[in-house]
Every structure is written in C-alpha cells, then in structure tokens.
A protein has these predicted regions:
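Catalytic histidine-centered segment of alpha/beta-hydrolase-like enzymes
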Residues: 322-333
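Short beta-strand/loop motif that positions the catalytic acidic residue
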Residues: 284, 291-293
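Conserved alpha/beta-hydrolase
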Residues: 99-119
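N-terminal cap/lid segment of alpha/beta-hydrolase-fold proteins
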Residues: 30-74, 328
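The serine-hydrolase catalytic nucleophile loop
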Residues: 86-98, 112
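Short beta-strand element of the alpha/beta-hydrolase
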Residues: 75-84
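Alpha/beta-hydrolase-fold enzymes
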Residues: 166-246
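Alpha/beta-hydrolase active-site loop
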Residues: 125-146
C-alpha cells in the first residue's frame, strides 16, 4: 500500500511539474511593440514609462504601457485603466494613466484583446466577457510588480470601458475601488439603442440580420467589417461630430484605433445583445464606486441609472459644461484632483 501511495504521489508531482512548465510557456508573450512614443499626449518627465506584455486567461497576449512615478519607494497603490470603447492605450486611457502616475500611483493602460497592439484574431472584435477578463488580466500583471501593493489596486474605465470596469470589479474582489468616467453600458446601447429606443421587433430584426451575416462570414472564411467609424457625411448628431473631432483630428487620432477611421466586425454586437454586464453591480459594495460624467453628455443617463442600481458607497460627480468626449482628454475638465482624492482614500 505504501509503495503504491508513493508511486501515486510521484506521478502527481510529475503532473504538477508538467503543468507548471505548460503555464510558464503559456505566459511567454510574443508581440512586437513599437519603441517610439506615439501617444496623443505629451510624455511626462515625472514618470518612468515602459511597454509591457501579458496574457489573459484565454491566452491572448495584451500590450500595455506601465507608468511608474519617478523616484518611487516602497510598495505603491496601483490603478489599471481601460477605454474608451474603440480606442487604444495611446489615447485617453494613457493620458489618465500617466496623470495618475504623476500623482503617486503605479498605473497600467492596456489595449483590449483583438485591438491596438494586443493579440487576438480576427482583428477589431469586442466581447463583454473577454474584455471584462482583460481588466482582470491587467490586475494580475500589475499586482505582480515588485513596487505594487496587491491589496491596493483600483480601476478606471472610460466610456464603454466604464461598464466593463464595473463588471470586472463586481467579479474581481481584488479590486478595492473603481471609477467609471463618461461611461457607456455597451450591452445596453447595443441591445436597446440610445435611450432604450429599440422595440422588440427591431431587436428581432437586428438579430436575424446578424445571423444572416454569420452565414456569409462562415462561407467566406473571414469576417465582414462595418463602415469606417467617425467619418462624417453630413447631418450627424452633435455627439457624433464630437467623436469625429476627437478621433479623426490631430487632437486624438491614432492609426491603430478602431474609432479613428477603422471599424468593428459586423457581428461584434452579437454577444453584447444578450449579456447585460451590470447585472451584478450591487456586488461591488462595500467597495466604493465613483461615477464621473459631463453635464452636457448625451451618455449621462448611463451613469445616472448605474448609480441608482449600485449599492453604497457610491458617488455621482457631474462635471459642469462638459460633454461626453471632453472627459477623454480635456485636462482642464477631467477632475483629476477628485480621482486622486478618491483613490488615496480608498487604496490605503
């Protein structure tokens, strides 16, 4: 009996060893990242910056920018930053990350799966599940940095990634505080339209069209893509003009961004149509949420209804005279002092 037990234990140890080797292999990134500073904002002299790579639990390699306060000592609080939806880390999320690093936090801005410099095929597809996982994978990475306190990690989600950050925080109890800035709930807007205006008949028709597109994609062996984003043709709503003025001008244009004249796959909405991401927002409590939104933003109702659905502690901070896109890059309007106070108080 003892001999058999020893053999069993030996086999178990060998299996664990093989599993560990597989895990090490799994964790090896293989992306080629640009070395040049190609952000839409000026590089700070107060912060050290480097490109990094890590994998999410689906095996997709993510590209990110790590920002560390210069001359930092000891274990520091950390913040992972994602968004806006269809943007890259060289845009708004990088600006937020660098600015918060100037204020004493180790920060990480990342490209979501299938976009920017991150891996994943086909290109330019989004998923409420995988993109929520991207946030938690960023927590994995930043929490393993030698200068980061694993018990003091927060999140910032911008635009459509505000909803993703809330979803990730609900499920990932390692996150101690979360900010949703100028947020969208992408599952709500894709399934119900702006201001919940889509009728059941319209929803059914959309799903039928998406099903038909799947037949075409399967037949062709490659996904079809939507029309280029943020190209104005005339007669657009003001918020669409605002998007153009950020993504398609020197203010915020970046060639790798979906929103800068590229496009999502036609079938990207499918999983968003049937997977509401804020179902468990109450489970973020007792960890705090800060919602930040512009007074004049077309999207303000997303933060207001999410705020009502969330449990305490929570706060909704309205930025006077700001529209949706202003909170992407207008450093005179983004309430960085408010964000700093929030994370300083709650990541301690």
């Amino acid at each position: 009996m003892q001999t058999r037990l020893k053999k069993t234990l030996s086999m178990l140890v060998l299996s664990i060893g093989a599993f560990s080797m597989n895990q090490n292999t799994f964790a090896t990134p293989e992306l080629k990242l640009t070395d040049k500073w190609d952000k839409t904002f000026v590089q700070s002299k107060k912060v050290d910056h480097k490109k990094v790579m890590f994998k999410n639990r689906y095996g997709i390699t993510l590209a990110a920018d790590l920002y560390i306060p210069k001359n930092a000592k000891g274990k520091l609080p950390a913040i992972v930053v994602g968004g806006p939806f269809g943007a890259v880390k060289e845009q708004s999320s990088g600006l937020y990350a660098q600015t918060m690093a100037e204020r004493g936090f180790v920060t990480l801005a990342f490209d979501p799966s299938y976009t920017g410099e991150s891996g994943g095929e086909p290109r330019n597809v989004a998923s409420p599940d995988i993109n929520t996982e991207d946030f938690s994978a960023a927590v994995d990475f930043i929490g393993l940095q030698p200068n980061v306190d694993q018990n003091r990690i927060g999140m910032i989600g911008i635009c459509g990634w505000g909803g993703m950050a809330l979803n990730a925080t609900a499920i990932d109890k390692r996150v101690k505080a979360v900010v949703a800035s100028t947020m969208y709930d992408m599952t709500r807007v894709m399934s119900k339209g702006y201001n919940d205006s889509v009728t059941p008949e319209q929803r059914t028709k959309t799903l039928e069209q998406l099903g038909a597109q799947r037949w075409l994609d399967a037949k062709n062996g490659t996904p079809a893509y939507q029309s280029p984003y943020n190209v104005l043709k005339g007669g657009e709503a003001q918020f669409q003009v605002d998007y153009h003025d950020y993504y398609m001008t020197p203010r915020g244009y970046h060639p790798r961004a979906v929103n800068s004249g590229n496009a999502w796959t036609v079938t990207t909405p499918i999983s968003f149509m049937n997977m509401p991401i804020l179902s468990y927002i109450k489970e973020i409590s007792p960890r705090p949420i800060l919602f930040v939104h512009g007074e004049k933003a077309h999207s303000r109702y997303f933060s207001e209804t999410a705020y009502e659905a969330a449990s305490q502690p929570k706060e909704l901070y309205i930025v006077p005279n700001a529209n949706h896109v202003d909170l992407y890059d207008r450093v005179d309007l983004i309430p960085f002092d408010k964000l700093t106070d929030f994370f300083t108080k709650n990541l301690k």
